[in-house]
């Protein structure tokens, strides 16, 4: 959490700052999995992609780009593909991306599909706290709904988001409860809520979403194409359109494009997004 503080020197952040260098060289810490939340509120606090090996880094660009794609924002197909393939614009050689769609701060995954706006009045700050831009949507009704069509649409969107996460190159981070549709009733800053807003209601699990997440996990464990951390190049994959032809520049630049296929040349595995 707030990892840039570990490498902040008088002239700014340095990935080779003494503390970070000592951690890499330490006989105990050096071979551990090191994970950075690469931003804080200090000067020069946003350092995504700069920690270097062996650090893994929370990738909020992944979160935002994937939410925007599934929200239906125009012109997002290129960013979607970049995140799906490991975020080569942020990392070199191997992906060190920790891919996530929701975290302890912000909306839960289910709330991303049920609330277009934050609802933080219970926090006592007149809804001023919490991020204002969540790249979320509500499927036509803000908040809780008993409309079966709305419920089905939200469940479909949650499944699509989970499927995207489990099909992405990099390390998966899934917040507790997101695998079965946990809601915070639109509260995106619930750290101080020790009540039903933040609690996990085990008896209220959406078993359909839970089964979908379980199946995705089982499948991913056997899929070396996704667990390999090497960044993908043209020799490894080809991006196809819905007709099975390589995407053209014009297709990549089409703001309305919503479909693509990621085809792995060696194994023949194809991931279809539509």
What are these regions (language model features)?
Residues 1-7:
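Short acidic catalytic loops
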Residues 9, 14-176, 180, 189-193, ...:
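Conserved alpha/beta catalytic core and glycan-binding cleft of carbohydrate-active enzymes
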Residues 204-233, 244-246:
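Aromatic- and carboxylate-lined catalytic core of secreted/periplasmic carbohydrate-active enzymes
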């Amino acid at each position: 959490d707030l990892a840039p503080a570990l490498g902040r020197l008088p002239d700014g952040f340095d990935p080779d700052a003494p503390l970070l260098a000592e951690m890499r060289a330490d006989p105990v810490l050096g071979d551990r999995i090191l994970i950075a939340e690469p931003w804080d509120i200090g000067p020069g606090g946003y350092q995504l992609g700069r920690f270097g090996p062996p650090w893994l880094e929370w990738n909020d660009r992944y979160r935002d780009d994937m939410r925007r794609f599934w929200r239906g924002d125009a012109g997002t197909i290129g960013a979607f593909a970049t995140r799906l393939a490991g975020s080569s614009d942020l990392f070199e050689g191997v992906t060190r991306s920790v891919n996530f769609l929701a975290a302890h701060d912000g909306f839960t995954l289910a709330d991303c599909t049920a609330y277009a706006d934050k609802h933080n009045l219970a926090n006592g700050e007149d809804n001023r706290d919490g991020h204002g831009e969540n790249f979320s949507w509500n499927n036509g009704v803000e908040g809780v709904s008993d409309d079966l069509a709305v419920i089905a649409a939200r469940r479909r969107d949650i499944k699509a988001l989970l499927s995207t996460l489990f099909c992405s190159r990099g390390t998966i981070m899934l917040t507790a409860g997101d695998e079965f549709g946990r809601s915070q009733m639109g509260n995106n800053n619930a750290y101080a809520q020790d009540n039903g807003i933040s609690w996990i209601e085990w008896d209220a699990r959406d078993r359909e979403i839970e089964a979908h997440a379980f199946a995705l996990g089982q499948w991913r464990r056997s899929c070396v194409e996704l667990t390999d951390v090497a960044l993908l190049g043209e020799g490894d994959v080809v991006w196809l359109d819905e007709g099975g032809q390589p995407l053209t520049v014009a297709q990549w630049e089409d703001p309305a494009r919503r479909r693509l296929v990621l085809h792995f040349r060696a194994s023949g595995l194809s991931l279809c997004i539509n």
